[in-house]
UniProtKB/Swiss-Prot annotation:
Keywords: 4Fe-4S, Chlorophyll, Chloroplast, Chromophore, Electron transport, Iron, Iron-sulfur, Magnesium, Membrane, Metal-binding, Oxidoreductase, Photosynthesis, Photosystem I, Plastid, Thylakoid, Transmembrane, Transmembrane helix, Transport. Its main location: plastid. It is found in: Plastid, Chloroplast thylakoid membrane. It holds the Pfam family PsaA_PsaB. InterPro entries: PSI_PsaA/B, PSI_PsaA/B_CS, PSI_PsaA/B_sf, PSI_PsaB. Phylloquinone binds at residue 671. PsaA and PsaB bind P700, the primary electron donor of photosystem I (PSI), as well as the electron acceptors A0, A1 and FX. PSI is a plastocyanin-ferredoxin oxidoreductase, converting photonic excitation into a charge separation, which transfers an electron from the donor P700 chlorophyll pair to the spectroscopically characterized acceptors A0, A1, FX, FA and FB in turn. Oxidized P700 is reduced on the lumenal side of the thylakoid membrane by plastocyanin. Its EC number is 1.97.1.12. It is a multi-pass membrane protein. This is Photosystem I P700 chlorophyll a apoprotein A2. The lineage of its organism: Eukaryota, Viridiplantae, Streptophyta, Embryophyta, Tracheophyta. It comes from Olimarabidopsis pumila. Belongs to the PsaA/PsaB family. [4Fe-4S] cluster binds at residues 559, 568.
Amino acid sequence: MALRFPRFSQGLAQDPTTRRIWFGIATAHDFESHDDITEERLYQNIFASHFGQLAIIFLWTSGNLFHVAWQGNFETWVQDPLHVRPIAHAIWDPHFGQPAVEAFTRGGALGPVNIAYSGVYQWWYTIGLRTNEDLYTGALFLLFLSALSLIGGWLHLQPKWKPRVSWFKNAESRLNHHLSGLFGVSSLAWTGHLVHVAIPASRGESVRWNNFLNVLPHPQGLGPLFTGQWNLYAQNPDSSSHLFGTSQGSGTAILTLLGGFHPQTQSLWLTDMAHHHLAIAILFLIAGHMYRTNFGIGHSIKDLLEAHIPPGGRLGRGHKGLYDTINNSIHFQLGLALASLGVITSLVAQHMYSLPAYAFIAQDFTTQAALYTHHQYIAGFIMTGAFAHGAIFFIRDYNPEQNEDNVLARMLDHKEAIISHLSWASLFLGFHTLGLYVHNDVMLAFGTPEKQILIEPIFAQWIQSAHGKTSYGFDVLLSSTSGPAFNAGRSIWLPGWLNAINENSNSLFLTIGPGDFLVHHAIALGLHTTTLILVKGALDARGSKLMPDKKDFGYSFPCDGPGRGGTCDISAWDAFYLAVFWMLNTIGWVTFYWHWKHITLWQGNVSQFNESSTYLMGWLRDYLWLNSSQLINGYNPFGMNSLSVWAWMFLFGHLVWATGFMFLISWRGYWQELIETLAWAHERTPLANLIRWKDKPVALSIVQARLVGLAHFSVGYIFTYAAFLIASTSGKFG
């Protein structure tokens, strides 16, 4: 018999229905479940796929550089970053009529183009790129790296080059390479680039391959480094009148601690950032050399974990057994990696707007909004993934004997306390926050706005004051001119920092009031509820009150009716599925809040946010409805405009989102009957019945339909909000 898809599962390949195709796609990457898989092949497959992932990333970034160099306006933009709109790439569309061609021809282009809202122009400009030739060079180099990665992936699947399992489980060597090699050396290399290329470029000096060996990054060269006079590198920094990209007002310092922002670009000082990366490099280079590898010195992770005895015996056997549990479970490792990466991605979103690193990006409002939203959504998906793999760990890899009475076992032992506390926190936040919003809503509706319950966030204001914000009048820590912390930092970074935090032209420590207090608690509700569902799904993955032993049922067993006691909504996958809806919901509130507050800030009418954000109708009317006017007006009797594409995307996003419900709210029997009817009609229709199929068509399983519904819901939701965000922001600020 000829081999049928999927080749990795002969059992599935013999399935006579269309289930074969869908289950095949669903389990294609679940290497552990494939026929004849060994631990060694599992690790090698994953290792090789990492090279493929890198190849795709390099190819993609290369494509960004190439298209901007070919079809963009980088060189024109560099001359006037505040007024020229950066072009991402040209649009070729045979359906465009004259009005469309005119609407999308902008940024000094000859034909229709897409405007870039990704911030790449600002990024490339900041790191010292200036010409299209620079961009082409970068694109070629990344293409080369991409090819190298593909070769690397192929090579490590060849018998001679296949790493052994012991190599994959050598935790100390991996830490050494990742901490020192990946983070340490690359941070050091980046410091080198900033000092040798980016900082000179910001002062109007071009350093390229032809002259980098004879241009001194600092007048004193390496002298101060070897004589220990490191402070010389910080002397004579760029002045506050420095024009970025020119020598006017520039200094000679390369590693500084100025604090605050460059007055013209509104971004962090390049010399501060070089200093930061150097410090990070040294930290990680040291950290990577703390663990015992081939040389018999340094710490053994296993010894560290075994030796740690919790005080007073309150955590049982502490970390005993954890080393082998984690080191032998790729799901546990992936869960930890995803949790870390998710948090970092969310931190990137928060810091990219509050402490902008790239020149002029703070004045490109649409890009700021797009980047914040983009990183928060990605963080949400990554974080939910961490819990999904945590749950799979408990089902596939957790061994109770190996972890007796250690911190992991104790988490499981008191999971009911954890889950009930989270549940209580969610209920408390939900009822109180909604209660306040609804009360305020009713007061506004009855024409008595003065009867709203408005709570000042005094603790958060106190924290802002402690960091130096003076407008609240708290006079504490850095906002108190007589304090020791204030005096200690006054000669170094404080003047720049205090200047930045008390200026209204940036997003550092925005002034907050009752509207912020309410939406903060709405977001807290979303975070706690999402966490509740995810934590319960992971901790109950092996067994729960209703179903004490789920081990052999696996991660995503389906809803099986009441016949055998009922298994609806109690697989770990079901918890993940529900959590994603809550995650999207929460990020909706986060991005609505960020965007509305910033729109009013940028337009100079911040009182609109302050007054309208304390009741639900304010959010619906003054944020969503008011800002969607551009989207509802993309096509009208007068033709079209440059926002029309977003108007269509807004509609299309709603369509995709609504399609999700077709999969989420329906019975399998209905679809099965429909499929049978269509198949029957097809087989009895002349000409049509010439086309036959081998697999009997069957309706999607419950789990599959939920996945397809969730995918449509998520994609539609994000498409809709992306169009809203970009159109409403670019429509106002150009």
